[in-house]
Amino acid sequence: MVNKKIIVLSIFISLSISIFPQLRLANIFGDGMVLQRNDSINIWGWSKSGDKVSVFFQGDEYNTIANNDGKWLVQTKHYLAGGPFSLKIKTQKEEIYLKDIYVGDVWLCSGQSNMHMKMKSVKENYPEEFNLTENKNIRFIEVPSQLNFNKSEQDIKNSNWSSLNSKSIFKFSAAAYFFAKDLQPKLNIPIGLILSAVGGSPVESWICEKSALNYKSVAKRLNEAKQEGFLENLHKKDKENRQNWFLEAEEKLLNNDVFYQPKSFDHTYKYKWFPFHKHTGVYWFKKEFYLDENSLSDTRLYLGKIGDSDSTFLNGKYIGNTLNRYVDREYWFSPKLLKKGNNTIEIKVYNFRWRAGFMFGDIMEFKSNQTNFRLMDEWYFADLCEMPPLKAGENKFWRPVGLFNGMIAPLSKLKLKGVIWYQGEANAKKDLAFAYRDRFSSLIKDWRSLFEKKDLPFLFVQLPNYLKSN
């Protein structure tokens, strides 16, 4: 019986070796990618230790040997902008073939939610941008979120390149899209955009450990993050705090007999006054609208962002909720919920920390196949209960160094034209803003060192605030 198990295990191992490929490229490489023009190009990956790896590009052949860890890298000559080309990598037993490769300028696009915000979030403000034909000279890839506080990751998580078209535009970074839209026709070359950004992240998340250790408070937060179980315990505590806050709020609503709806609406609030600064707690918003007919389809409410969490109802029926103040609300619903004549939207809002209600500047709209109209005028609202602010939670992505190691360091061999950076709200507080000028300088030095380009261009937006300061 033991011998049979050994035989079966041996067969499984031999099959694994033959079935699963040893040769692979770093995940930044793929069909449709853009490589940097007028510079040597690094192409790298992994194979079986000792394998001869051959790379074929534009009629040229490059050869190398995989090292003891299986890593390999070839460096090509300089190439002019152009495409499409193919890229072939092979060993004696395996082959990888990539198609639709272009050579042009490659830009790394990083920061917090300013850079991460997708075109789908600005569609209501820029509808004309979505009526486009395919532009193969603008390409985009997003680096998936990944953290490491102890060492640099060797590779990013799997992702794919996309050329710009009417479908892919929705997932493009809005800031990066408008940057490329302006730049590409002026240069008349392919533009590659690599998005590596995380909402809410401070500058400290994107610097290397050596730089982090130069700042006492930053080094302390990094050392805490390295401790086993530390972040998990913080997350658990944050979750408990949030649950307790909700339970206390619900108890107050029940005691005041306003859990399901307010007794009356005593106030109106103009859209231009939002968000307002009364207090944290629970509010109820209400608006009526009139329909001449009810034979509609593709019905939805677009409400923009709401501070902080909402539950939304149409004619007394629940149609959706969102917990995050930074996410645009778009709620699709059955047209059967509508009626000819007066209809009512009601929104129950839980405000945890600051600035309750709608966000001035966001589009608010009723949409359907036949009729669209804006909802950006007066709303009734009721103040249901006051609550103490919920203590700010801990986000693991905001700890120092983790994003540098996880989402920048794995790209270190890539050749770039430059970096566009849009970040700052997370560092705009009084105790952080002054330190930002030094820490952002550290980031630029870190990245230039990482990519081995001492004059790597950095185009950046400085310390934008979130909403008005008052």
Where are these regions (language model features)?
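Beta-strand-rich ligand-recognition modules
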Residues: 59-82, 305, 312-363
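Short beta-strands within extracellular/lumenal beta-sheet-rich domains
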Residues: 27-31, 279-292, 329-331, 405
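Ser/Thr-rich low-complexity repeats and stalk/linker segments
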Residues: 22, 28-103, 353-358
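Aromatic-lined ligand-binding clefts that engage carbohydrates, nucleic acids, or primary amines
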Residues: 44, 289-316, 345-347
